[in-house]
Every structure is written in structure tokens, then in C-alpha cells.
Swiss-Prot record:
Co-factor binding details: Binds 2 Zn(2+) ions.
Function, in words: Zinc phosphodiesterase, which displays some tRNA 3'-processing endonuclease activity. Probably involved in tRNA maturation, by removing a 3'-trailer from precursor tRNA.
The protein's required cofactors: Zn(2+)
Active site, UniProt feature: 67
Family that this chain belongs to: Belongs to the RNase Z family.
Binding positions for Zn(2+) 2 per the UniProt entry: 67-68, 211, 269
Subunit description: Homodimer.
SUPFAM superfamilies listed in its UniProt record: Metallo-hydrolase/oxidoreductase (SSF56281)
Designated name of the protein: Ribonuclease Z
Catalytic activity: Endonucleolytic cleavage of RNA, removing extra 3' nucleotides from tRNA precursor, generating 3' termini of tRNAs. A 3'-hydroxy group is left at the tRNA terminus and a 5'-phosphoryl group is left at the trailer molecule
Keywords assigned by UniProt, alphabetized: Endonuclease, Hydrolase, Metal-binding, Nuclease, tRNA processing, Zinc
InterPro entries reported in the protein's UniProt record: Metallo-B-lactamas (IPR001279), RibonucZ/Hydroxyglut_hydro (IPR036866), RNase_Z/BN (IPR013471)
Length: 307
């Protein structure tokens, strides 16, 4: 599991930062990539990475401002020409269906794969045997959502050495034991599978938040997260400006991570006014509140290990 940032700027494309998009790479977990937001030229950014559009399974749109959305029709269309045949689901606020369907219809774009569009509200918006995704509305003056991706706990490892000490040889019986079943050996020995399986492996939590002021919903989404991706459009000194434009400062983001008990914070959605030393100062401001903070740049990747 890793995060790969495709666009980390705010508002409009800039020379050093494209507009918003981040990929959650789940290649080992499910052979898929999930995108969060799809600003203009996201598919151009993808060309400079190892991401394969045909592996994009879900796209989550935080809100309908253009810098988070305008790259979506092009990416959906291009996926058809890049061997994309598996279904893809777009999740987003009310209006996302009209936007996508109109763009595809007016441009005469025909998709070779099944496209599902889900207009979301708060709550669980996706759930399967491995992951769930929870959405909550943030404070941005228009419907803007944050997403909490929860990896479900994995079964503990089979304690092979203990089984071998009892003379239990590898075979189909190992699978039964790993499932916690009670099995009877050829010599009549009864084995309780639960005693030969280690503790469950704790699933990881990733919170990806859309544009927002500081708010309690952001804290709830980030609670105990392994990684929080939070906008930091403005420096701490621009608190009034951030509030007026429904955005966050560096210290707003850091305070969310601190109150949530998160492990790690990654800042994104950075105004183009902050370059070079000014950008480094943003990190310093956030670290004064939440030390384990990093600043995303385009094409930066962050591994998310277990534990």
C-alpha cells in the first residue's frame, strides 16, 4: 500500500504543481489503484508513473470544483484505449453523474467498460471483504467530502513451527487449521486451530480529506489513521484568508492530525505562492504542532507499512 501524489497544487495548474489528484496503490492488496480527485491533466501526470489506467478500480471525487474534477472525462475516455475493460466506479457528490454523463455524451465518447457512478452522502459508501470507505462532509462552502479508507484486519499467521513440533506435516490440513477449525490427526490427536494461529494483523487506515476549513468531521475521519492527507492551502499567518475562502492553514491540518491521534500527516493542495524556502516553512509550521508531517510534491510516493 502506498500513496502516489499526481497533483499537489491549489486552484490552477502551476509549473511545479499540477492540480489535485492522489493515487492509493493497492497492487499487493487487490491488484488495483484507487484515485482521489482527478484535476485537469491527471492522465498526463499518470504517463510519468507506473500507474496503469486499466488497473484503476475506483475514483473518489471530494467535491465538484474544477481543480479536483476537470481531468475526469479525459481519463475515463483514455482508459478505453489502454486495455481498460474491467468495471470502474466513480464516487462523488450530487452532480457528479450529470457532469460525467454530459461530458461523455457531448464528446461522443464511448466506453468499452462498465462505468458505475455513485452519488454519495455521509456514511459507508463502499464495503467488501478487504476494505471499507467512509465519507463525511467537511466545511468548504459547497459539498466537500473526506474519505476514510479502512483495511480490515487480516487473519494471524499460521504457527508452522508449533505444528511441525507435533509432527503435523504441510498439506490441506494447514488451511483448515489456519481457519481456526478443530481437526483430528490420524493418531487421534485433536488440534484446536485457534491455538496455532497468531494474533490478527491490524488493518491500516488512510484518511484523504477534500478542501475544508478546520472542522470536527476532519478529526473524526482522521481518528487513529496511519496516514492523513490534508490540504494546507495557506501558511499559518494567513488564517483569516484561509477561513474566508473555506480552506485550511498548515497548523489547521496539523491540529487535525494531533487531535485525531494520527500517526502521520501529509500536506497537499499548496498555493503557488509558496515556492522554495517558503514551501519548506510550511512544513516547519505544521511540525511545530504535529512533528510527523511531510509535504507532498508531484510524483512523491509514501509507503504505508503495517504496524
Amino acid at each position: 500500500m502506498e500513496l502516489l501524489f499526481l497533483g499537489t497544487g491549489a486552484g490552477v495548474p502551476a509549473k511545479e504543481r499540477n492540480v489535485s489528484s492522489v493515487a492509493l496503490q493497492l497492487l499487493g492488496e487487490r491488484g488495483a489503484t484507487w484515485l482521489f480527485d482527478c484535476g485537469e491533466a491527471t492522465q498526463h501526470q499518470i504517463l510519468h508513473t507506473a500507474i496503469r489506467p486499466r488497473r484503476i478500480e475506483h475514483i473518489f471525487i471530494t467535491h465538484l470544483h474544477g481543480d479536483h474534477l476537470f481531468g475526469l472525462p479525459g481519463l475515463l475516455g483514455s482508459r478505453s484505449f489502454q486495455s481498460g475493460e474491467t468495471p470502474l466506479t466513480v464516487f462523488g457528490p450530487k452532480g457528479i453523474r450529470s457532469f460525467v454523463e454530459t461530458a461523455l455524451a457531448v464528446s461522443g465518447t464511448k466506453l468499452r467498460y462498465e462505468l458505475n457512478i455513485v452519488e454519495i452522502d455521509e456514511g459507508v459508501i463502499f464495503d467488501d471483504e478487504r476494505f471499507s470507505v467512509i465519507a463525511k462532509r467537511l466545511d468548504h462552502g459547497m459539498p466537500s467530502y473526506g474519505f476514510r479508507v479502512v483495511e480490515k484486519d487480516l487473519p494471524g499467521p499460521l504457527l508452522v513451527e508449533r505444528l511441525q513440533a507435533l509432527g503435523v506435516r504441510p498439506g490441506p490440513i494447514y488451511q483448515e487449521i489456519k481457519q481456526g477449525k478443530t481437526v483430528v490427526l490420524d493418531d487421534g490427536t485433536v488440534i484446536d486451530g485457534r491455538e496455532f494461529v497468531g494474533p490478527p494483523q491490524k488493518g491500516r487506515i488512510v484518511a484523504v480529506l477534500g478542501d475544508t476549513r478546520f472542522c470536527e468531521a476532519a478529526i473524526e475521519l482522521a481518528r487513529d489513521a496511519d496516514v492523513v492527507v490534508h490540504e494546507a492551502t495557506f501558511a499559518a499567518a494567513e488564517q483569516r484568508l484561509a477561513h474566508d475562502y473555506f480552506h485550511s492553514t498548515t497548523t489547521d491540518a496539523a491540529e487535525v492530525a494531533r487531535r485525531a491521534g494520527a500517526k502521520r500527516l501529509i500536506l497537499t493542495h499548496i498555493s503557488s505562492r509558496y515556492q522554495g524556502e517558503a514551501a519548506l516553512q510550511l512544513v516547519a509550521e505544521a511540525r511545530s504542532v504535529f512533528p510527523n508531517t511531510e509535504l507532498a510534491v508531484d510524483f512523491a510516493s509514501f509507503s504505508i507499512p503495517r504496524g
